[in-house]
Each structure stands twice: as C-alpha cells, then as structure tokens.
Amino acid sequence: VDKRRPIWVMLLSSYWQDGNSLGVDAIMTNYPEDVK
C-alpha cells in the first residue's frame, strides 16, 4: 500500500474494484468534507 495516498482514495479504489457501495458509504461517513 502506498501510504502517500489518502485513505479515501484507497477506499474509493476498493469501491470500484469490488463494486460495493460500502466503500462510498465509508467515505461519506468518515470524510464528509472530502465529498462535498
């Protein structure tokens, strides 16, 4: 894992790779300022 990447980028990547909305839900819950 490249620690230089923000956690939300890794979560978003997991969302696209897994096709699972939980990745986006985690971003919305934990990093609301990043998605506004």
Curated annotation (Swiss-Prot):
Enzyme class, spelled out: lyase
PTM statement from Swiss-Prot or TrEMBL: Contains 2 disulfide bonds.
EC number of the protein: 4.6.1.-
Tissue specificity field: Expressed by the venom gland.
Catalysis performed (reactions): an N-(acyl)-sphingosylphosphocholine = an N-(acyl)-sphingosyl-1,3-cyclic phosphate + choline; an N-(acyl)-sphingosylphosphoethanolamine = an N-(acyl)-sphingosyl-1,3-cyclic phosphate + ethanolamine; a 1-acyl-sn-glycero-3-phosphocholine = a 1-acyl-sn-glycero-2,3-cyclic phosphate + choline; a 1-acyl-sn-glycero-3-phosphoethanolamine = a 1-acyl-sn-glycero-2,3-cyclic phosphate + ethanolamine
GO molecular function, one term: metal ion binding
Note accompanying the cofactor annotation: Binds 1 Mg(2+) ion per subunit.
Cellular component terms (Gene Ontology): extracellular region
Job of this protein: Dermonecrotic toxins cleave the phosphodiester linkage between the phosphate and headgroup of certain phospholipids (sphingolipid and lysolipid substrates), forming an alcohol (often choline) and a cyclic phosphate. This toxin acts on sphingomyelin (SM). It may also act on ceramide phosphoethanolamine (CPE), lysophosphatidylcholine (LPC) and lysophosphatidylethanolamine (LPE), but not on lysophosphatidylserine (LPS), and lysophosphatidylglycerol (LPG). It acts by transphosphatidylation, releasing exclusively cyclic phosphate products as second products.
GO biological process: killing of cells of another organism; lipid catabolic process
Cofactor: Mg(2+)
Chief localization: secreted
Cellular localization per UniProt: Secreted
Keyword annotations of the record: Cytolysis, Dermonecrotic toxin, Disulfide bond, Hemolysis, Lipid degradation, Lipid metabolism, Lyase, Magnesium, Metal-binding, Secreted, Toxin
Family affiliation: Belongs to the arthropod phospholipase D family. Class II subfamily.
Name assigned to this protein: Dermonecrotic toxin LgSicTox-beta-LOXN2
